[in-house]
Amino acid sequence: MKAYYQLSGEEVLREVNGSEEPLTKEQISENQRKYGPNELTEGKKKTTFQIFLEQYKDFLVIILIIAAIASGFMGDIESAAVIVIVITMNAILGTVQTVKAESSLASLKKLSGPEAKVLRDGVVVPIPSSEVTVGDIIMLEAGDYIPADGRILECASMKVDESALTGESLGVEKTTDVIEQDEVPLGDRINMVYSGSFLTYGRGSFVVTEIGMNTEVGKIASLLKTTSEKKTPLQVNLDQFGQKLSILILVFCAILFGISVFRGENIGNAFLFAVALAVAAIPEALSSIVTIVLSFGTQKMAKEHATVRKLQAVEGLGSVSIICSDKTGTLTQNKMTVEHYYVDGQSISADKIDLRDPSQSRLLISSILCNDSTNIDGVEIGDPTETALINLGSSLGLDPEEVRVKYPRESENPFDSDRKMMATKHSLNGVPTMIVKGAVDVLLNRTDWVEMKGETYEITEETRRVIEEQNQKYSREGLRVLAFAYKEVSDETELTLEDEDHLIFLGLIAMMDPPREESKAAVEECKCAGIRPIMITGDHKVTAAAIAKRIGILENESEACEGAEIDKMSDEELKDFVEGISVYARVSPEHKIRIVRAWQEKGNIVSMTGDGVNDAPALKQADIGVAMGITGSEVSKDAAAMVLTDDNFATIIKAVENGRNIYRNIKASIQFLLSGNFGAILAVLYASLMALPVPFAPVHLLFINLLTDSLPAIALGLEPHSKNVMKEKPRPINESILTKDFLINIGLEGLSICTMVMIAFTIGYKDGNALLASTMAFATLCCSRLFHGFNCKSNRPVVFTKRVFNNIYLIGAFVIGMILITLVVTVPGLHNIFKVQTLTLSQLLTVYGLAALNLPIIQMIKAVRAKFRK
């Protein structure tokens, strides 16, 4: 069966209506029952309560729940209550972060206007868009939203903005002509209109062929529902980390419990040791700390024009190895600009126009007069190609409005897509003159003369050939070319179409949406950082390739392809194909998803940028979807993890740099937490093996994990950013947080902390006072971890350099933490709550001294390890 664009309007009417007449009332009712309302449907969503319950599925949380229950059974109600409060607070925080209203489909619904003008019973009547059905004939005027997909029946100079669906920035000229080719991309189906687009110029009518979820917008809605959001590398890492840590904790707890029972301890005490170990090992505040650090990251990125909608995207950007970028407005300025003139037989850069040259001056003035656009106080109204001509005149010192007042328009033949030209009549220095603007081939066929240096000559075949070659050269460079001509006409008559002949060729004007000034440098920085930039656009291949070459994405033409080529490939073939392609043109939403997925299956973290409705499914499929804030549709913003408020590719590179630094800082926070916890675990194990009392009560460990540890961990997450991260390659997708080097650091640092803690415990226990020993061990562990924060600034020695003082947050966290632990062990009113006793001044100084020793010891370890790495 042929596609609708391959059929005439009458054939399509017979196909969907059974005749060439509008629908009858009975047919309308039947079709509405058959096809349903013209609406987009949404899938079932999880309730907030379901999301809240899912927060308790984490292995670490389950272990904490068991620890709380065990503490309660053993009579330690305070510890059990604190653990439950911590778990609940983390669950609430996780729920708040997860509950993001999935409003993409709601935004898609807004793309249709509330009403449509439908021909029924021979009368045009407005009806709600939801009541439009297959077979309806819709009447369109400039400014109307198109409520459904359909085949054009009547067309009077129609131009449709389809940018939301295709990504093409210019309005598409429509026609009623049949298209013979098979598998024509959506952007080239010039006899069809689609829901989600709107008429910018002209008028016409169309017969509805698809409604609701069967429209092109509906297909995008279906893709949004079936495209699952991927976890960021950090989420995957933390999940894996949680599972591994849970297994380790359970193994350690089982070993400790077995040793205690084997040594003759009663089961109650053995359980207490196991619970203490579990609480010591689990970094209860980790989830909250990561969230807080990421939140601070979003604030920093917002100042740099990147608004983060999904918190984990902050870090995820740092892992990106492929950036698939839209062209228009992201890599380019999204503003048509004149690049070259061809006049007097030569190509001239736009900024080199000489207004003293009569032909150059006439061409510039003609481009202002034969033009319907305006630019008043910076507000541009009209077709982008026409506003580009106005803006050039302004930049060269010509006031377009003054030119138009001096040479007012007396008559015109408006532009239409069949003639591909427009003409206006003016009195130029007392001579009635018709100025004509249009497609190069059309004007050349109507030209008998050519002007050079103010003189008119009969045009020769050689001159035509040179002009055509220049036009082809501009086109190969991705430039949009307009030809200008003129001739003297009668003073007393209105222009007619017959006047548009025997013209004097004046010149060509070539324009394009040029690259942003910063795009080339951003692409180069991208490559230096080991990230491959790829252009994906709905625009034409020649235009896309020209821009990509100028900014360094494309090196040769073989690296560019069109969406039609992708249709012929299987997913496996596409996986091999993407390696050699840097530019994709004329692509559909399905193509974009397949390209993103192909790179993901090759082990890459993919960021996708976009602004149109057509980009939304790929934005959701990508690891990090990035939408445009200025030109972007609400649908694309809803589907994205991040929104660029300046629509600038260079901003993505800044975000990647932030993401890499934030990951590095989060890793430092995790190292800080785990090394401290490992020190506590070793202390508990040592006490158990040496038949000593439990060195810590669960409340001690919770105090450390939630209060004195949290502040330094957050401060490490705010560590000043390194300028060297963009010289590194993206980290591998399968790289775990728990690398061999990372685990060695944790082990050595934990051993140092444990040693100082057990020395303090031994000093306190010399008279058999278990409470004093526990208090000194607790205080030393707390202070050791506060000092250890400075160790975690880097895996290289930093304490004896000026870098030790470059994080004011860490210094503040250290001071606050030291004050808190000092208050706990010196204020009597807090003793019962925290299961401690008062320490004397000498005991306090002993605690401080032992804790401080961790600094030089660990710094020496780092220095030795750094030397061996070389």
Region locations from a protein language model:
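Generic alpha-helical transmembrane segments
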Residues: T708, I753, T775-G789
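Conserved cytosolic headpiece of P-type ATPases
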Residues: M1-K727, I737-L738, L751, F761-T762, ...
